[in-house]
Amino acid sequence: MTATATEQGARTAAATGRIARVIGPVVDVEFPADAIPGIYHALTAEITLNGATHAVTFEVSQHLGDNLVRAISLQTTDGLVRGAVVTDTGAPISVPVGDGVKGHIFNVLGQPLDVAESEIQYTERWPIHRKPPSFDQLEGSTEMLETGIKSIDLLTPYIKGGKIGLFGGAGVGKTVLIQEMITRVARNFGGTSVFAGVGERTREGNDLWVEMEESGVLKDTALVFGQMDEPPGTRLRVALSALTMAEYFRDVQNQDVLLFIDNIFRFTQAGSEVSTLLGRMPSAVGYQPNLADEMGLLQERITSTKGRSITSMQAVYVPADDYTDPAPAATFAHLDATTELSREIASRGLYPAIDPLTSTSRILDPQYIGKDHYDTAVRVKQILQKNKELQDIIAVLGVDELSEEDKIVVSRARRIQQFLSQNTYTAKQFTGVEGSTVSIKDTVEGFTAICNGDVDHIAEQAFFNVGAMDDVERQWAKIQESTK
């Protein structure tokens, strides 16, 4: 292992100060006038608590004047006292990069959580604060990333090298869908994946680790966690740590990279907490005044450059199912495709609970996905929209009062809704049914058949939680057999 110039510079530039004030995770430190650390510099101090000594790291956020800097702690400050010595490392927080990080879990500081640090083989560390690629390095993409999930591939096709958002309230299936994407896309991808666990449940992180190990994708994946029980500074920076690892694979190794972030809302929430702790005046709904700026600093680095890409899938919690909330609203502008999960669809047991009418994609256009695919997607949306408009009439007067034409629309819409459901590999442990992967060709043909009325004779329940139309016909044969 070799030290980088950054590490050598940190040792020669080391300056010490003393803690003047501690308020939870916020620490004010006094330094000599000629050795004030720069913004984003990492500071370290030793804490002795219950007879054990450990290091705690801070990040400089503000210069207060009078030789004072205000820093945010990235670990608990229990046991920290006024007058304690703090050392300026002379550089921002940095994380290990390269092939050595694959197959391991790290914290925000790049310290491995599954093995001893000496077992991680790396030759370089990169600072987590980096500039985005310059404009002339960027390269747009319209190539479709096939997932094998019918509702996504048909109605909100994902873009290779694009940014994809999975929006939804609590308990509608965001994390399950992210885990499903890891299983499906990473398994068939062949490149490197990086997962950022931002402010989510530790249990889910453990489940993901076990699942990735069993599915064989762990060896090509680096995981970086800053979970719910971590200080806000950690939750704010952990996405940057993971992104830095992904950037190395893109820029140095010229790889196509998958970046999964769960959950972007927790990143925003941590920024709000840090902003309040720093004494900034809150903005709309209590969020930080620099919300758009913070989101932009992260999202602008998640991009594709000439010849290589970072494809990002981000789960976004929607507070109280309110899509006008500033946190999800700030995320929307950066995305190429949005998949919105509906509580109403989830309540009917239709998973993945994707809302086909509100989900969008930049490449849902005949010049990118082909005329047949586009025409079928439009017809499906038209039928579902017409069915939605008829629901008020049905609620008051009943289905029998509809015209024959409207009855056909409702009947086909119900088949489409059932056919949009699909067994997933992640949910096998709960359902006992193996997941299914459907090609885009079979998906388009299946929904075209429903729209044309070719399968009006098949009962609705035969379309529930199946793969392609062949599975529907097998299911229908079983239903007929059981009713004889």
Curated annotation (Swiss-Prot):
It is an enzyme of class 7 (translocase). It catalyses: ATP + H2O + 4 H(+)(in) = ADP + phosphate + 5 H(+)(out). It is a peripheral membrane protein. Pfam families: ATP-synt_ab (PF00006), ATP-synt_ab_N (PF02874), ATP-synt_VA_C (PF22919). Its EC number is 7.1.2.2. The keyword Nucleotide-binding applies. Belongs to the ATPase alpha/beta chains family. NCBIfam families: atpD (TIGR01039). This is ATP synthase subunit beta. It comes from Renibacterium salmoninarum (strain ATCC 33209 / DSM 20767 / JCM 11484 / NBRC 15589 / NCIMB 2235).
